[in-house]
A protein has these predicted regions:
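Structured loops at beta-to-helix junctions and adjacent beta-edge loops in soluble globular domains
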Residues: 16, 30-31, 117, 157, ...
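Surface-exposed patches in mature extracellular/periplasmic domains of secreted proteins
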Residues: 10-17, 101-105, 233-238
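Short, surface-exposed beta-strand/loop micro-motifs that present aromatic residues
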Residues: 14, 26, 58-62, 245-251
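Short, solvent-exposed polar/charged micro-motifs at secondary-structure junctions
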Residues: 21-27, 123-126, 244-247
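Loop/turn elements at helix/coil->beta-strand transitions in domains of secreted/extracellular proteins
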Residues: 8-11, 23-25, 67-70, 108-113, ...
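C-terminal accessory segments enriched in acidic
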Residues: 162-168, 172-291
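Active-site/substrate-binding loop(s) of hydrolase catalytic cores
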Residues: 31-34, 42-77, 82-217, 224
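A non-catalytic alpha/beta surface segment that caps or lines the substrate-entry region
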Residues: 1-35, 40-44
């Protein structure tokens, strides 16, 4: 990301602070050069619209027309879900280098806030352990907590804010007021290839219906785009609910929270299909929410 920022006018690289173990907490801001040149003004608009008291409806509409939405994307809060950070780098490279009209339109109409790893400490621990034990009988998932204090439960800290990494993410929310947050995860390897919203029941009754509807609209748009591109294994309204307040900070502050769960690999080892190499992996029967 640092190299892309050096060579492209579409990316700004920033280290927002340090993590529990002293690693950098990175934010990449990606948009058109024109949007990045007026980033302060776009952030000012977001703050005005985030708290519109004193704005007339006409003023609010004018600000919305002048501004562009901010989309906050973060990956690998769970450090054994290694594919997402790798994907972030690929996405950033495409947005920095692709000269197609499609990418130009995206960059003109959105500011993407990218945190490549929400738990950099765990990523270092998991990756170093894999390399240290590669080709030995001890090669397996990192055997200890991959966050020093919270382990896998670091994404249940969005209402207590006990950890440095959570507070660094909250600072991004406070500074930029993004319209959408997207949390990238990985799930089991034998089911669907990707989960997108809408979520299954139960739903937290404290979430405003317009936000649950916004999540559903964005998720279904993602599913439709994937299916139209010939991608198989998309599931929605399944597995993941919207109940616990432990991860609802974004929704309690007026943003749809998009969760994606991608089928897992075995870290950097080959994933062998237990049904046989020539057999499909995962369920093959269509359902209304698994076309």
């Amino acid at each position: 990301l640092q190299l892309l920022a050096e060579r492209s006018g579409r990316i700004e690289y920033e280290e927002r602070g340090t993590t529990t173990l002293g690693n950098p907490y990175v934010l990449a801001t990606i948009s058109s050069p024109e949007n990045l040149a007026r980033l302060d003004r776009l952030v000012e608009i977001n703050h005005q619209l985030n708290d519109p008291r004193g704005l007339s409806e006409a003023d609010a509409m004018a600000l919305a027309q002048e501004g562009v939405p901010f989309y906050f994307l973060y990956a690998t809060i769970h450090s054994t879900e290694v594919g997402n950070t790798q994907t972030i780098i690929t996405i950033a490279h495409r947005l920095a280098a692709d000269q197609s009209p499609e990418i130009a339109e995206m960059l003109d109409n959105v500011v993407l806030l990218v945190v490549p790893s929400q738990n950099p400490d765990g990523q270092v621990l998991v990756i170093d352990h894999w390399y240290d034990t590669k080709d030995t009988r001890y090669n397996r998932v990192y055997p200890d907590l991959y966050h020093r204090y919270t382990g896998h439960d670091n994404n249940r800290d969005w209402f207590m804010f006990t950890q440095k990494e959570t507070r660094l993410a909250i600072d991004i929310h406070r500074d930029f007021k993004p319209q959408v947050t997207h949390d990238m995860h990985q799930m089991g390897s034998r089911g669907a290839r990707i989960f997108v919203p809408p979520f299954r029941d139960p739903y937290d009754p404290n979430i405003h219906p317009i936000l649950t509807e916004g999540q559903a609209q964005i998720g279904i748009a993602m599913a439709s785009a994937l299916i139209s591109a010939g991608k198989k294994g998309v599931v929605y309204n399944d597995q993941y609910d919207l109940w616990t307040p432990a991860r609802q900070y974004m929704l309690y502050h007026g943003q749809p929270r998009i969760l994606t769960e991608i089928a897992s690999a075995r870290l950097a080892d080959p994933l062998i299909n237990p049904s046989g190499e020539d057999q499909p992996l995962g369920p093959q029967t269509s359902r209304w929410n698994f076309p």
